[in-house]
Amino acid sequence: MAPSQRQIEEREARKQRILDGALNVFKANGIEGATMDHIAQESGFGKATLYYYFKSKEDVFSEILEAGWKNIWESLEPIIADQGSPRNSFIKLLIKIAEIAQARPGLFEFLFNAPKTIKLENQPWKEYQHR
C-alpha cells in the first residue's frame, strides 16, 4: 500500500527538522566536531530516526548543501532565462539573492562558508556552484 499524502508530508517535515537541527550543529561544530548524537539532540529525534533518513553525518551535510544550492539555482534560473536587458537581469539576480539570504540567513551563510576542501566521496552540491 502506497503512503498517503499526509504520511509523505510528515516524512518530509521530519526530514526537514533533522536538516534544520543539523545545520545548527554543523555551524557550531563543523563537520569534524558534529556527531549524529548532536544532530539527534538538536532536531529532537532519536538516533534511529536519523539513521532511517541518512546513513551518516556526511550524508546529512551533503543533503543540506545540495538542497540549499538547488534552491538557490532554481530561484535564479527564471531570471537568467529572461530575455530582458543584461542590466535589469543583473539587478533582478542581486535582489533575488538578497531575498534568499534574508529568508534563511543561517543556511545562506553555511552554503558560502562550508569548507571547500571537504573530502567527501560524493559532492553533488558542487554541480550548482559551477553552473
Q: What residues fall within each predicted segment?
A:
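Short coil/turn segments at alpha/beta junctions that flank glycine-rich nucleotide-binding fingerprints
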Residues: 28-32, 83, 104
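Amphipathic alpha-helical packing segments from all-alpha helical-bundle domains
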Residues: 70-73, 77, 121-131
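Hydrophobic alpha-helical connector segments
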Residues: 63, 77-103
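Residue-level detection of the helix-turn-helix DNA-binding "recognition helix"
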Residues: 41, 55-56, 66
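Basic, helix-initiating cap at the start of DNA-binding domains
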Residues: 1-29, 33-42, 59
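Alpha-helical DNA-contacting segments of helix-turn-helix folds
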Residues: 61-68
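Short hydrophobic/aromatic patch on the recognition helix
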Residues: 44-54
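Amphipathic alpha-helical segments used for helix-helix packing
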Residues: 101-123
